[in-house]
């Protein structure tokens, strides 16, 4: 390193330390990127910049990596720890020169040829200031926007104004030893490395800032000038007998209603504001598997985020997480109900585009919306939409609305230049601000329209909301999905877009189910959900602190022994710490006596806990059935358990969006039985599986596990009993009568869960019965009870509470519910 460079690093050290806040992406570089701190490291940056090097030094200090400003000694020779592709752009010249880095790499490869024990890691690092994507017509604000190789004067203003938005993005380490062994050590290999690095940095910039922003005129011309929209305008003019100009003006108004107006400045302001809010209301945000989206972006994929929808907070939380994981914030599909002043304008500038709840019958609106979405895909913008169509009121996933997925596939048919990947996202909370209004809606109250009053009321009520959880599920490569399900899908590219191919609906339905199962596969266990599940499974909804702590610990140990999936996450903390943090959320009554503390839901708030329990109920479906069988029969065999799972799993799979196939579910059950035995939640006598002894400390946990699926089984029993009573019944009548009986049982037995008699949940189960051929169909569409269905009813009735079983038997025999 020259004396001039050392002097500049010393001079700018304190100004940079004062002005710059370096954000490292990712934080866990060893695990995610394979960087070995014990081996020598050289950092490769795109531009020779003192401030970039100093901000990188701040980041490496935080990550305990070698300093980029120190000299690196290799085989007795000294090298700079930081290499650059290009020099800084001169003040009065339009382009930056290369640094002659090829010669340095050639020398390093020769060094590896001569020293077999040497293994240098080349770590590409992209340093960006701000995340401005650039515009077709630059304005004054673009003078301080970061660019590939700014002059020293421009860099001065960039650091002054964007120093707090500095991002250090590390890439996977490249082994110089591996390259030297595989490709040799001549100059052509160094040239190839430099060329690949240059392309890599371009993609990295694209993934962090996104493509150049569309100007409004360009947007209008692209949408209105498309063949589909022009045909729709002509059809609108002809069918409604209005002038062509009026129909075109209507299409223009739809664009204005729909389109986002992305402003990077608002994103930066929102980042600062949300950081303050999150620090106030959350104890932390846990993010899982973010490396997946970074890898997709690095490979040039168009990314479509499809998260579950728990709360209006989802819009902000997921965008915030994506931004802090080093990705460009997506354009977000939002319901038109959120387009009210001033929130609508803020959302629009944050990347939201608005859609109506239904497009039915409005061909012009449909054409404009489709063309706008296709334009986003083709220009390279990432997109986010909610497959459920609305927020879940019960805490469980809602059957998906397939409209947006269908439009996405139709866009593929018209030709999207890049590979498209759909990324399912699980979002979980320990406290949802809307949960009270959700339960009121389930009880029949009318949904309140979103308004400023609601926003201010929500802000006023901000408090300790515990942890937030965002897990990125396994991506679905849409091209590969279509190849496997519809091998000839490319033949439809030239077909008229208004005509749907016959394969579209079944393919979209399969894709939608795939999305939902991958969301649930990436579930996050948390303290609130586990505590809620335990208390609601107990007979009196009250437990001692010691019992609760033991049960939470036992359940966490069970999922560590037999994970629900590779994508599901378990808290790192102990059961004691998890319970302590959960009790601070203020959802529980805590009473203390001479024997310790008793914990129960706050008065009349047990129903709220069902929401959080339902977030993770699908994880407990199979272990819950296993233990329900063991306790109900006071002992059973593994073969009997496997037969029970084989019968019930297809129904649970449909309702709870479980990812395992039938064979995988049986293998999972087998592994669970072994883990339950090893963990003391089961005991074995000869071939018989029995509950733990009553004096065993795991007994209470096993008992709770046996009760956690009771409401689901009881709901099944209600539907099957009415089918048994009627023998032949229309689907509508079955849903109505099932709802009436379930409501009555809920009142009689004090069931806290509103979804016990929710029409949508009952309908989903009836649909699963039909799909799995438990029911026969009459010519008029009525459902006919079958012998197979009777066998299923007997299995289910044997698992529910005896008093509930007796009540339902009276219904079957006499048609009485009292």
Swiss-Prot record:
Entry keyword Manganese: no
Keyword Acyltransferase: yes
Example GO molecular function: glycerol-3-phosphate O-acyltransferase activity
Enzyme class: transferase
Secretion signal span: none
BP GO annotations: CDP-diacylglycerol biosynthetic process; fatty acid metabolic process
Record localization: Cell inner membrane
One Pfam family in the UniProt entry: GPAT_C
Membrane topology type: Peripheral membrane protein
Key words of the record: Acyltransferase, Cell inner membrane, Cell membrane, Lipid biosynthesis, Lipid metabolism, Membrane, Phospholipid biosynthesis, Phospholipid metabolism, Transferase
Chief subcellular location: membrane
Cellular component aspect of the GO annotation: plasma membrane
Enzyme Commission code: 2.3.1.15
Reaction catalysis annotation: sn-glycerol 3-phosphate + an acyl-CoA = a 1-acyl-sn-glycero-3-phosphate + CoA
Domain statement: The HXXXXD motif is essential for acyltransferase activity and may constitute the binding site for the phosphate moiety of the glycerol-3-phosphate.
Similarity comment: family membership: Belongs to the GPAT/DAPAT family.
Protein known as: Glycerol-3-phosphate acyltransferase
Name of the coding gene: plsB
